[in-house]
Amino acid sequence: MTEDIMATSYPTFLTTPYLPMKLLMNLTNDTEDICVFDEGFKFLLLPVSYSAVFMVGLPLNIAAMWIFIAKMRPWNPTTVYMFNLALSDTLYVLSLPTLVYYYADKNNWPFGEVLCKLVRFLFYANLYSSILFLTCISVHRYRGVCHPITSLRRMNAKHAYVICALVWLSVTLCLVPNLIFVTVSPKVKNTICHDTTRPEDFARYVEYSTAIMCLLFGIPCLIIAGCYGLMTRELMKPIVSGNQQTLPSYKKRSIKTIIFVMIAFAICFMPFHITRTLYYYARLLGIKCYALNVINVTYKVTRPLASANSCIDPILYFLANDRYRRRLIRTVRRRSSVPNRRCMHTNHPQTEPHMTAGPLPVISAEEIPSNGSMVRDENGEGSREHRVEWTDTKEINQMMNRRSTIKRNSTDKNDMKENRHGENYLPYVEVVEKEDYETKRENRKTTEQSSKTNAEQDELQTQIDSRLKRGKWQLSSKKGAAQENEKGHMEPSFEGEGTSTWNLLTPKMYGKKDRLAKNVEEVGYGKEKELQNFPKA
């Protein structure tokens, strides 16, 4: 950090932003043992950049974690890695307000030494855990593309949980010395929270920082580059179709994702580590003051890029994870459809829906709440001792053939379109706003289609009625079946108890006294149930 007193071979001093740069350079030329920095730019750059990362990164990462938890269960290995990556980004973003205050107040830290150590720890913990989780994702995707059979057999979510625990443990152990090095230094007018350490310990800190950089950045960087290079080579292999060689769209999309990840990795992490290493060793070697100033400015500019990784990771989730992309799009569409429906009702309060061709879907018996009998007596009170007879076989058959009707109308549901005002067109409902020529023509087409559909339904209904009249299927109660057979009564009766279950009897298979009612598939799923005897109303 530039707020640290530099541990070079000559004495160095930090300036305030109030001294002009020309005077500082003249002072540097006159005294060879003094190198003066002008760091006024960072008091504007860092607060603004950290504030932007906080305002953008916090909602994005919280939304990502919510989608992972609420919309994407159960998790696969990639989802496990991405959730831990989002958790790491969220913890770091939550620490940024303290740094915004620190740099806006010109290197004044009023929060104490413990919080200073914690904030610096979170920065490097997020930095290196992000790199390691991206490495895990890269290795997992490489195995899935280049070795799909072995990856399915050997890699699952449990293994991913273990790997993530090892990543957190490794990063924490590697950064424990950083908690010891980082400290605060009280000055006359302010208190400095060192990003590195005190000047007398700076040489040892550089050695430690170099080892951590090679272990947690250098090696993962090589692994990521190797995995994505091999994946690109595998995906670039075309598929031979006849005499032509084509590259499928999913392979092109995967290659674009790889390019995006590599560019994001290069922008966020590479410049920061290169300029930081140059800055540390330039201070140790005691190079010329002008060159040291240039390296210092470059290092400060690249620090916001490392923090911006917390905002780029959610974009990576959207591009690299198909499940995340589908869940996010579905959630956004559901949220946006609610105000559209409200606007539709408020903008057209007097319009009445008109039914188009085809019957409406019938609610299944399980969806009807039941508190006893659906039949009411003369006093209007519900009773379990009453029964209603249904003599209209068409209503019964409509219930029995509900699934076939819905399936027949499924093709109409797929033809959903947008009306003139951009609102969703609802199936079987048409809102007439204007009686113009085009509307009348569409109504004529709708009438023709409805007549055809009604004709088909009538033909199907006739066939079912003929079956009922022949006695192939019969609806009746248990004890009343014998009486109905003697009288030749074929009128089906409806059971109004409970969930209004429809019961189907096959009299040829059972005796007159021991008849069982077989539930319709929608309600009973093939289970048999005895009908209870209720007196006819």
Curated annotation (Swiss-Prot):
KW Cell membrane (keyword) present: yes
Keywords of this entry: Cell membrane, Disulfide bond, G-protein coupled receptor, Glycoprotein, Membrane, Receptor, Transducer, Transmembrane, Transmembrane helix
Cellular component per GO, a single term: plasma membrane
Subcellular location as annotated: Cell membrane
Pfam families, alphabetized: 7tm_1
UniProt keyword Cell membrane present: yes
Region (Disordered): 401-505
Chain intervals with Basic and acidic residues compositional bias: 409-423, 431-447
Transmembrane segments: 50-70, 80-100, 119-139, 162-182, 211-231, 255-275, 293-316
Disulfide bonds: C116-C193
Stretches with biased composition (Polar residues): 448-465
Extracellular-facing ranges: 1-49, 101-118, 183-210, 276-292
GO molecular function, one term: G protein-coupled UTP receptor activity
Residues bearing carbohydrate: N26, N29
InterPro entries: GPCR_Rhodpsn, GPCR_Rhodpsn_7TM, P2Y4
Cytoplasmic side: 71-79, 140-161, 232-254, 317-537
Membrane topology according to the record: Multi-pass membrane protein
GO biological process, one term: transepithelial chloride transport
Main localization, broad class: membrane
Name this polypeptide is given: P2Y purinoceptor 4
Organism of provenance: Xenopus laevis (African clawed frog)
Underlying gene: p2ry4
